[in-house]
Amino acid sequence: MAEINKPAFKKPDLKKMTPKGERKANRRGAARLAAVQALYQMDIGGAGINETFAEFESFWIGNEVEGEQYLPAEAAFFRDIVAGVVREQKQIDPLIDDLLARGWPLARIDAILRAVMRAGAYELEHRKDIPARVVVSEYVDVAHAFVEKDETGMVNAVLDQIARRFRAEEFSKG
C-alpha cells in the first residue's frame, strides 16, 4: 500500500472549493485539482511523470484518503494537463515570471501556487476548447483549497493577464 503522508503531497481543504454536482465539469475540476497536486509532487519530490500518473490514478483520484473523499476525475484531462505543463514548462515559466510583481520571481513563489499557475497557463494557451473565464475561475477555485484569499488574488491576476494575451477575442465580445 502506498504511503499516505508523503512530504511532497499537499493536502487540499476540499471544503473551500466551490461545491458542484456530479457532472463532466466536476470531473474536470477534480482533474485540475489532481493535476496541481501531481505537479506539486513532481516539483518538490522530483518524481517522474509516469510514476506520478500511476500513483495518482491508482491511489488518489476517486478514493478516500485521510478521511477526505477525492472525486473521480477525467483521467485523459488530468494526463493532458500534467504532460502539457511538463512539455511546455520552458515556455510557461518565463511567461508567468514576466507577470509577477518585480522582486517576486516564480522560483520564490510557493510551490503549490507555481503548480496552479503553470497548469492554468497551459490550459489557457493550449486548450482553446475551454473558455478562458472557466479556466481562470477553476484554477482560482483550486488555489482556494490550498492558500488564503490574498494569494488567490495573485493567481487570478496572473491567469487573467495570460488569458487576455492568448484569448483576447474572448474578452472583446463584451
UniProtKB/Swiss-Prot annotation:
Q: Which Pfam families match?
A: NusB
**Record has RNA-binding as a keyword:** yes
Q: Which InterPro entries match?
A: NusB-like_sf, NusB_fam, NusB_RsmB_TIM44
Can you cite a GO biological process for this protein? transcription antitermination
The UniProt keywords, alphabetically, are: RNA-binding, Transcription, Transcription antitermination, Transcription regulation
Which NCBIfam families does the protein's record reference? Answer: nusB
Q: What does this protein do?
A: Involved in transcription antitermination. Required for transcription of ribosomal RNA (rRNA) genes. Binds specifically to the boxA antiterminator sequence of the ribosomal RNA (rrn) operons.
Q: What is this protein called?
A: Transcription antitermination protein NusB
Top-level taxonomy: Bacteria, Pseudomonadati, Pseudomonadota, Alphaproteobacteria, Hyphomicrobiales
What gene codes for this chain? nusB
